[in-house]
């Protein structure tokens, strides 16, 4: 063994013992003829002292520079009074070094590891192997390892089997674009990288493996956001012979145990909320319950007003008119209101009406807004009473299609909560249930809200008769406004699966071509089954307080789905393309 201890393992109990450390020189200091080296490894840092009494070792220490890889042997001793470093786990001790071996020298890093705040993300990703040396980055990956270990331990203890499913499979419509892999041996045919192990885990249920899990790599060729990557990791779980309440209870126990083990946080029982209630009160199917602001529908008070902006949507069943009260917001300057108006425009809102409540006792005279002249005073009072407005508040309004208003004011609610520091707690887990089975498109066609394999809460005949109002047996776990995991009871009867396919516009021939293997499996005694998948990257992001999942993945892609370190994706030579039966067409230049 080249080392006896990690730096982070050193403490006062080792006083007087000889230790050997291996790591990187984090910092070098020369104080009054004594050289101090801070040595860093994956577990932490330790201070090593070299004095001139050992001339050869002192000279070696004098030559080392930051990021040199070294092996150091010395004796642990307590630091002198007043020299204890409370910010370092080993800050109560230091090592008196008497042997130093330089294992490798290092050029000056492209950015200092002690002063990283102003370094651009692209530079950090280009030199990710340097960036990961920073203690806060190493801490995140260590925590990620602890998280996966805790989850595996829980699932193993509860009788789940870790089963791997294929990476090379065939394309199936799951909502996003597939990454395609050309086949050399089957000219003109392509594999697809899996967006999830969905169908294979269902087939494992048919095969009798009634408790399955996998820490699975998944791939989606879609536009990136702060919480998206083209390849991501999923905690994939499937069970047979459990209903949704049992699956939710089991996975909730897993998350509660995880937070207790890793962060020493105790969660109570997670509240449940229907999709309809979440959209009505919060404008989102993943509400952040730390935020006390709520949307309040006021269409009934505006149906007969002489103001088409409100009256039109108030009389349209596909629209909503909603109010959002911000306590103490009446002092908000017009420039800030304009900023929020521009913000809701991102979500399709055509404007942002408002009423400043200066002094309610004065009636309309105590309200400041360009819209109050269009609304009878009695209706205004009813609206202000309903939202709980008091002097000093501002009330925002949205009036448009249901989806536009929900998304716009739902996003504004989140923005206001952060801007005005309204969050009431650090963690707010919950379940959202009773999702619609389908989303209706403008042309009257339907899209599966979750995926085509989710079971509805009705018979096939009822589903085909009333698809727009059918509810699914789906459930999402939400934490702080982020979807942590989503799942459902699956369809386990062939007739129901075919009915869902038909409603999605997938006719018999296409069903057989794309899903024949699944339909075959459902004929041979498929058990009732369901499951759930958690996004591991999102989970780690939340538990570490990172701002992006790129911060908790060792080697992530950029926002443009590229790796600036390896220069992937890259070109391949003509021979490889010929073997794959592929010919590239030159793009026509636009003049």
UniProtKB/Swiss-Prot annotation:
InterPro entries: Aa-tRNA-synt_II, aa-tRNA-synth_II, aa-tRNA-synth_II/BPL/LPL, Asp-tRNA-ligase_1, Asp-tRNA-ligase_1_N, Asp/Asn-tRNA-synth_IIb, AspRS_core, GAD-like_sf. It is found in: Cytoplasm. PANTHER family: ASPARTATE--TRNA LIGASE, MITOCHONDRIAL (PTHR22594:SF5), ASPARTYL/LYSYL-TRNA SYNTHETASE (PTHR22594). It catalyses: tRNA(Asx) + L-aspartate + ATP = L-aspartyl-tRNA(Asx) + AMP + diphosphate. The keyword Membrane does not apply. Keywords: Aminoacyl-tRNA synthetase, ATP-binding, Cytoplasm, Ligase, Nucleotide-binding, Protein biosynthesis. It comes from the Bacteria. GO terms for cellular component: cytoplasm. The record marks 31, 82 as: Important for tRNA non-discrimination. Gene3D superfamilies: Bira Bifunctional Protein, Domain 2 (3.30.930.10), GAD-like domain (3.30.1360.30), Nucleic acid-binding proteins (2.40.50.140). Homodimer. L-aspartate binds at residues 174, 220, 450, 490. Aspartyl-tRNA synthetase with relaxed tRNA specificity since it is able to aspartylate not only its cognate tRNA(Asp) but also tRNA(Asn). Reaction proceeds in two steps: L-aspartate is first activated by ATP to form Asp-AMP and then transferred to the acceptor end of tRNA(Asp/Asn). It comes from Pseudomonas putida (strain GB-1). This is Aspartate--tRNA(Asp/Asn) ligase. GO terms for biological process: aspartyl-tRNA aminoacylation. Residues 198-201 are annotated as: Aspartate. HAMAP family: Asp_tRNA_synth_type1. Belongs to the class-II aminoacyl-tRNA synthetase family. Type 1 subfamily. It is an enzyme of class 6 (ligase). Its EC number is 6.1.1.23. It holds the Pfam family tRNA-synt_2. One of its GO terms (molecular function) is aspartate-tRNA ligase activity.
């Amino acid at each position: 063994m080249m080392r006896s201890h990690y730096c982070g393992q050193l403490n006062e109990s080792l006083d007087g013992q000889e230790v050997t450390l291996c790591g990187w020189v984090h910092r070098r200091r020369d104080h009054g003829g004594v050289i101090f080296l801070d040595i860093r490894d994956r577990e932490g840092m330790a201070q090593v002292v070299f004095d001139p009494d050992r001339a050869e070792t002192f000279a070696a220490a004098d030559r080392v520079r930051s990021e040199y890889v070294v092996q150091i042997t010395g004796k642990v001793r307590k630091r002198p009074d007043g020299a204890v470093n409370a910010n370092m786990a080993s800050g109560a001790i230091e090592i008196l070094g008497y042997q130093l071996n330089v294992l490798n020298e290092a050029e000056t890093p492209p950015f200092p590891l002690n002063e990283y705040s102003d370094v651009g993300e692209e530079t950090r990703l280009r030199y990710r192997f340097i960036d990961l040396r920073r203690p806060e980055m190493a801490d995140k990956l260590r925590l990620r390892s602890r998280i996966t270990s805790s989850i595996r331990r829980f699932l193993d203890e509860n009788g789940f089997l870790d089963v791997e499913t294929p990476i090379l499979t065939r394309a199936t419509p799951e909502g996003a674009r597939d990454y395609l892999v050309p086949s050399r041996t089957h000219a003109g045919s392509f594999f697809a990288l899996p967006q999830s192990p969905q169908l294979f885990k269902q087939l494992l249920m048919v095969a009798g493996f009634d408790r399955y899990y996998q820490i699975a790599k998944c791939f989606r060729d879609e536009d990136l956001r702060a919480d998206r990557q083209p390849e991501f990791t999923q905690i994939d779980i499937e069970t047979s012979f459990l209903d949704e309440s049992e699956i939710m209870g089991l996975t909730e126990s897993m998350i509660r145990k995880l937070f207790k083990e890793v962060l020493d946080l105790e969660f109570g029982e997670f509240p449940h909320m229907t999709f309809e209630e979440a959209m009505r009160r919060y404008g989102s199917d993943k509400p952040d319950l730390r935020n006390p602001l709520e949307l309040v529908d006021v269409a009934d008070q505006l149906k007969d007003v002489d103001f088409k902006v409100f009256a039109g949507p108030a009389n349209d069943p596909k629209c909503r008119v909603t109010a959002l009260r911000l306590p103490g917001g009446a002092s908000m300057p017009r420039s800030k209101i304009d900023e929020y108006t521009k913000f809701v425009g991102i979500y399709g809102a055509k404007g942002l009406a408002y009423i400043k409540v200066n002094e309610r006792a004065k009636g309309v005279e105590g309200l400041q807004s360009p819209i109050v002249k269009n609304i009878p005073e009695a209706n205004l009072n009813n609206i202000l009473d309903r939202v709980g407005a008091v002097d000093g508040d501002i009330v925002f309004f949205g009036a448009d299609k249901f989806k536009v208003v929900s998304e716009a004011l739902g996003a504004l609610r989140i923005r206001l909560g952060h801007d005005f520091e309204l969050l009431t707690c650090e963690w707010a887990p919950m379940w959202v249930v009773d999702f619609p089975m389908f989303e209706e498109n403008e042309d009257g066609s339907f899209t599966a809200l979750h995926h085509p394999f989710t079971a509805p809460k009705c018979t096939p005949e009822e589903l085909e008769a009333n698809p727009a109002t059918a509810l699914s047996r789906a459930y999402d776990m939400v934490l702080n406004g982020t979807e942590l995991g989503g799942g459902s009871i699956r369809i386990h009867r062939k007739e129901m699966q075919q009915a869902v396919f038909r409603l999605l516009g997938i006719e018999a021939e296409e069903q057989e071509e794309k899903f024949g293997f699944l339909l075959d499996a459902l004929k041979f005694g498929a058990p009732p089954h369901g499951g759930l998948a958690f996004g591991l990257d999102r989970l780690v992001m939340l538990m570490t307080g990172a701002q992006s999942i790129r911060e908790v993945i060792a080697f992530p892609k950029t926002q443009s789905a590229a790796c600036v370190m390896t220069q992937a994706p890259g070109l391949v030579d003509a021979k490889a393309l010929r073997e794959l039966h592929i010919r590239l067409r030159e793009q026509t230049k636009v003049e």
